[in-house]
């Protein structure tokens, strides 16, 4: 169907007369650029008429233009005799075009757009990302792996393969989540239910765990055995999309077990934020802060960062490249305490400046060397690699990312019989606090000084690592009492006064927070008494730890520390 088939004849005649007059006038304004061997012109419309402000693009390039008030466009700077494929997109429509080649000089191009539904279909059945799910649909009703992975070329990591190893893909099966939810260790041993006592002033309040009974760490279900909570709102969003507070993440099935899965992310149309703060509303975690466009029966809908993916039922959504996309699951308030706030930390930093800053995607979805994101034999197109976002999304388990998060400068010298070590750590490469998100995460700075015989020098000044850094053998990761410090957001449970606490589903308060905000520096000084005659070696190490070591032991998690910075300095005593 072309742009005019649906008009009555009289309306068509009037429309064509007005359009022709407009085109004549606009041709005079553009003076000579309307028809040439280096331009293509035409009209973008839907069955009701022209569409203004539509983006027309030479597919896979940055050569684009915007339609005028009458839907007219002119694409410039084309190579003579070199055919191109054009696409068009406008808000509220699927991307159109993408099928016909046009030679420069063509002046009668017509691209018809189809409007997509402006409602969310709650009856939509999610598509699995995996071919192993067994469903093989037709067209775009297919699994993601089929077109977005290269099974016969492991050197090429397309989006499915990158996502498969990412924490988002593993969020529903994250054993730290599941054991913290159930109150178990990795072997399934469960801690006793929380004990309570009735008080005159405060009513029923919780008690600390019974020290005479086996304890395998905290658990949401130990404190709230009859509630599902809202963990699923972020960790199993496909399952929780319509039941954010009623989905138990340990019982989800099907696509829900795929975590933050492909189909879920590409059904996101917008994010609901508080206009005053720029943050999600406190009572709207995860899926509650997203606006979705699940398509009606017989249709599909994929929103993405390109406005030229055609043909197909795809559309462009600017939110896909904005940090606000990440806000619903990277900001969390429990009992009026801000527990995690990566998005807000970014928002408060210079990185949020739209002119000079960086988005979450700039750092966590940087382009790699791939020049296509869908298999070429499945309709994929060659593109500039710098326009394709990686789906590897490195985060707290990525060693390379962590080792490029902060800078550490050390000055070590002797004054008389004292070794003075000054350590400065600067968050100069990260757009939020370090560490961020889960309050279980922390950095441990460890300073050791030893003489030529390998004997450790006695610390005579400076802070030491607190008890919750681990009481025991330093060679096994128990660093309490050693020279150094910990960078962390420490929560304390209000009723039991347990701290540091990872059970932030309970009422807590922020006991302390000395994490490194963007572009801030922490400087600390340590002194050691020395009787060495020749040389002292100072070892300075900054490590990232996923959780408090006591909790790691209780849950039996396998979460090795990651060394972020490490320096050894020899100090001459002469």
Listing of model-derived features with the role each one plays in the protein:
Residues 32, 101-129, 133-134:
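Extracellular beta-sheet/turn segments enriched in Thr/Pro/Gly and aliphatic residues
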Residues 94-102:
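Edge beta-strands of extracellular beta-sandwich domains
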Residues 123-127, 156-218, 244-530, 541-574:
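Primarily the internal scaffold of c-type cytochrome electron-transfer domains
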Residues 25-39, 411-417:
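Beta-strand-rich domain onsets/edges
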Residues 80-93:
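A short, solvent-exposed beta-strand micro-motif common in secreted/extracellular proteins
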Residues 35-54, 79:
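Structural motif
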Residues 52-55, 60-77, 100:
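Short, acidic Ser/Thr/Gly-rich low-complexity loop/linker segments typical of extracellular
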């Amino acid at each position: 169907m072309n742009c005019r088939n649906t008009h009555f004849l009289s309306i068509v005649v009037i429309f064509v007369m007005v359009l022709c007059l407009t085109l004549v006038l606009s041709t005079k304004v553009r003076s000579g650029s309307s028809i040439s061997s280096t331009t293509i012109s035409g009209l973008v419309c839907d069955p009701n008429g022209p569409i203004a402000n539509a983006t027309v693009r030479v597919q896979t390039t940055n050569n684009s233009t915007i339609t005028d008030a009458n839907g007219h466009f002119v694409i410039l700077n084309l190579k003579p005799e070199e055919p191109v494929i054009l696409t068009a997109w406008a808000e509220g429509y699927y991307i159109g075009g993408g099928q016909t080649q046009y030679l420069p000089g063509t002046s009668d191009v017509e691209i018809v757009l189809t409007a997509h539904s402006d409602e969310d279909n709650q009856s939509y059945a999610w598509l699995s990302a995996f071919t192993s799910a067994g469903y093989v649909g037709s067209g775009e009703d297919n699994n993601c792996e089929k077109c977005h992975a290269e099974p016969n070329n492991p050197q090429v990591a397309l989006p499915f393969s990158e996502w498969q190893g990412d924490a988002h893909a593993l969020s529903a099966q994250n054993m730290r989540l599941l054991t913290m939810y159930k109150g178990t260790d990795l072997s399934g041993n469960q801690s006793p239910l929380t004990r309570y006592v009735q008080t005159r002033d405060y009513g029923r309040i919780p008690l600390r765990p019974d020290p005479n009974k086996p304890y395998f760490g905290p658990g949401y279900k130990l404190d709230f055995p009859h509630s599902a909570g809202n963990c699923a709102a972020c960790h199993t969003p496909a399952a929780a999309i319509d039941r954010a507070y009623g989905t138990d993440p340990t019982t989800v099935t099907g696509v829900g077990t795929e975590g933050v899965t492909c189909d879920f992310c590409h059904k996101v149309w917008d994010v609901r934020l508080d206009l005053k703060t720029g943050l999600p509303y406190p009572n709207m975690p995860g899926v509650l802060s997203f606006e979705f466009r699940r398509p009606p029966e017989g249709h599909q809908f994929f929103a993405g960062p390109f406005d030229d993916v055609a043909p197909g039922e795809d559309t462009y959504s600017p939110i896909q490249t904005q940090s606000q996309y990440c806000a619903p699951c990277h900001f969390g308030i429990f009992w009026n305490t801000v527990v995690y706030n990566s998005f807000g930390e970014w928002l408060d930093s210079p990185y949020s400046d739209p002119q000079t800053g960086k988005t979450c995607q700039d750092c966590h979805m940087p382009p790699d060397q791939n020049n296509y994101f869908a298999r070429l034999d499945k309709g994929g197109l060659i593109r500039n690699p710098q326009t394709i976002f990686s789906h590897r999304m490195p985060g707290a388990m990525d060693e390379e990312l962590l080792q490029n998060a902060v800078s550490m400068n050390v000055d070590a010298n002797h004054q008389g019989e004292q070794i003075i070590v000054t350590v400065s750590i600067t968050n100069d490469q990260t757009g939020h606090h370090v560490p961020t998100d889960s309050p279980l995460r922390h950095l441990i700075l460890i300073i050791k000084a030893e003489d030529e015989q390998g004997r450790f020098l006695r610390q005579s000044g400076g802070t030491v690592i607190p008890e919750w850094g681990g009481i025991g053998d330093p060679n096994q990761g128990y660093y309490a009492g050693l020279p150094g410090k910990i960078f962390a957001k420490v929560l304390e449970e209000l009723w039991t006064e347990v701290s540091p606490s990872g059970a932030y589903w309970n009422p807590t308060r922020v006991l302390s927070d000395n994490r490194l905000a963007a572009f801030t520096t922490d400087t600390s000084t340590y002194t050691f008494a020395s009787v060495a005659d020749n040389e002292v070696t100072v070892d300075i190490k900054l490590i990232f730890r996923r959780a408090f070591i006591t909790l790691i032991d209780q849950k039996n998690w396998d979460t090795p520390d990651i060394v972020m910075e490490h320096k050894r300095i020899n100090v001459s005593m002469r």
